Amino acid sequence: MKQSFYRYLMTQRDPNNYEPVAQFANNAFFDQSFPKHEGDYELLSQYLELNGSYLPSMLIFDEAYQLYQESEQA
């Protein structure tokens, strides 16, 4: 069963890690509106472009999404 992007992202959380993907995960955790059951790149990207003020660059999302896809293929 394919996990949602959010569920994958939560595996990257670490308050002591200042890497961009970890910080994205930490901030997404506090985003009450984050689409937690979504896995579609376009829908997630659109949400973050409109609501992800905590994300300094969409390149971070792209990197995290790439890691998510790789984890789903393993």
Curated annotation (Swiss-Prot):
Pfam families: YozE_SAM_like. InterPro entries: UPF0346 (IPR010673), YozE_SAM-like (IPR023089), YozE_SAM-like_sf (IPR036806). Belongs to the UPF0346 family. This is UPF0346 protein LCA_0996. It comes from Latilactobacillus sakei subsp. sakei (strain 23K) (Lactobacillus sakei subsp. sakei).
